[in-house]
């Protein structure tokens, strides 16, 4: 490879990569170009040379894709929170289906060439869909700013009007920044070793319009005045909490969360039932598409009244509780104590007596349940982006529940895990759901059915 940094080269884009970048070949060398689209002929400048590929910056487009659109966001190229806003939305959906195909081709689970990968289910109005805002804070020119860090940098992009963020959550964080200035509240800066407010989280219930606000701080700060002003200005705010995180790691939250004002949880609805959300509990970022995602999961698992169901990575119990009136029993686990408290509370509020929730890692709790005699016939897993733990995979291959649905937020770890799972299960179909329009991320529901004959035996 004779390419060098700052060298300018012509390139034809052959496809798009998993991060939404354009991919082409220059003299057999793989070139990644953010912002370029499939089919375009461009001129780019090399920014980084690696062992077997190079990265480049888009300079000019000589032949433009007919699917290229002007991004509506004025800070799109600077922010990095969205990666494919320059691609027409219907083609974004095609791209996300292709992401699944790319991941499967890379990991090659048995029979992947014939998997039924269904068209991505998109949104009619793919704007302002994020019900949860999580912005970092810094001080610039004497004023507090909140936003996202530019990719691979420590530069915070000030965001005043995010086009994918719920409008009320954006208004609240803008007001919070003003009040942090007015009350002279210290703001975190790792380079200057300043302690203070480092992250602002705002979450809104789509069903009730109730809002939670969390200040993540590296030290105790006096928020009394800010809380008084905010709750007077925004009656939708029902909870204000503080989370303490003094670590220098990239983790957003620390272990300790305290309610400073208001109620300890807000109410949300999905599939016609209501449930509680405490500040630290996980819930999907896009409530509208969550309805679609959970409906797809219900259809795929196809439970009966005799089934015993495990809801792994259960969060507040929202998926498992959608099945509770259709099965004999539901068990779930999560590593966040507040989530398990919420799950138990939600089950009780709905009047279910056939549910059980336990705090712990799925890879530890599920083997214990099987050894204790709980024979699950159905399983739904909704793991984090890291996918299924190896210990959990071994457990599933050993005990082999008859039905399984895998809800994935990372196509790469999904494809990796399927390499093991297809030793026991057949992939009936994969349904992609667009939970994050204008980004390179997608969600997928995989229906897995136990093979009639397989090489793995129960132990």
From Swiss-Prot:
Keyword check for Iron-sulfur: yes
Residues the record lists as binding S-adenosyl-L-methionine: 284, 313, 334, 382
Keyword terms of this UniProt record: 4Fe-4S, Iron, Iron-sulfur, Metal-binding, Methyltransferase, S-adenosyl-L-methionine, Transferase
Biological processes, Gene Ontology terms: rRNA base methylation
Binding site for [4Fe-4S] cluster: 73, 79, 82, 162
Domain of life: Bacteria
Residues annotated as domain TRAM: 2-60
The keyword Transferase appears for this protein: yes
A molecular function (GO) term: 4 iron, 4 sulfur cluster binding
Active site residues according to the UniProt entry: 409
EC number in record: 2.1.1.-
Family: Belongs to the class I-like SAM-binding methyltransferase superfamily. RNA M5U methyltransferase family.
NCBIfam families noted in UniProt: rumA
Protein name: Uncharacterized RNA methyltransferase SMU_1779c
């Amino acid at each position: 490879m004779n390419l060098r940094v700052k060298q300018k080269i012509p390139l034809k884009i052959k496809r798009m990569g998993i991060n939404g970048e354009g991919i082409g070949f220059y003299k057999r060398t793989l070139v990644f170009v953010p912002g370029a689209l499939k089919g375009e002929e461009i001129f780019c400048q090399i920014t980084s040379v690696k062992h077997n590929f190079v990265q480049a910056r888009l300079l000019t487009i000589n032949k433009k894709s007919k699917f290229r659109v002007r991004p509506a966001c004025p800070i799109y190229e600077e922010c990095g929170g969205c990666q494919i806003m320059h691609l027409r939305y219907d083609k974004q959906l095609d791209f996300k289906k292709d992401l699944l195909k790319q991941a499967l081709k890379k990991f090659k689970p048995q029979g992947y060439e014939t998997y039924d990968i269904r068209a991505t289910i998109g949104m009619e109005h793919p704007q302002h869909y994020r019900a949860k805002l999580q912005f970092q804070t810094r001080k610039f020119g004497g004023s507090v700013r909140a936003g996202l860090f530019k990719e691979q940098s420590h530069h915070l992009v000030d965001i005043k009007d995010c086009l994918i963020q719920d409008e009320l959550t954006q208004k609240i964080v803008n007001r919070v920044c003003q009040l942090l200035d007015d009350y002279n509240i210290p703001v975190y800066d790792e380079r200057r070793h300043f302690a203070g407010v480092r992250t602002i989280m705002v979450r809104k219930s789509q069903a009730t319009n109730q809002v939670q606000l969390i200040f993540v701080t590296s030290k105790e700060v006096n928020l009394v005045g800010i809380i008084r002003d905010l709750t007077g200005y925004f009656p939708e705010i029902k909870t204000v909490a503080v989370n303490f995180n003094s670590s220098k790691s990239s983790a957003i939250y620390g272990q300790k969360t305290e309610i400073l004002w208001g109620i300890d949880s807000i109410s949300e609805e999905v599939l016609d039932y209501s449930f509680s959300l405490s500040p630290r509990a996980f819930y999907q970022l896009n409530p509208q598409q969550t309805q679609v995602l959970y409906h797809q999961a219900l259809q795929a698992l196809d439970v009966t009244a005799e089934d015993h169901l495990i809801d792994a990575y259960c969060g507040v119990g929202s998926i498992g509780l959608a099945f509770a009136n259709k099965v004999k029993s539901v068990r779930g686990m999560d590593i966040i104590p507040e989530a398990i408290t919420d799950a138990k509370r939600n089950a009780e509020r709905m009047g279910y007596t056939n549910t059980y929730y336990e705090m712990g890692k799925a890879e530890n709790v599920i083997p214990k349940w099987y050894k204790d005699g709980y024979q699950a016939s159905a399983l739904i897993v909704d793991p984090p982006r890291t996918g299924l733990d190896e210990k959990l995979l071994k457990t599933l291959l050993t005990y082999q529940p008859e039905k399984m649905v895998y809800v994935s937020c990372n196509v790469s770890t999904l494809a990796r895990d399927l390499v093991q799972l297809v030793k026991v299960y057949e992939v009936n179909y994969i349904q992609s759901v667009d939970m994050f329009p204008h980004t390179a991320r997608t969600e997928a529901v995989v229906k897995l059915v136990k093979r009639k004959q397989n090489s793995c035996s129960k132990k």
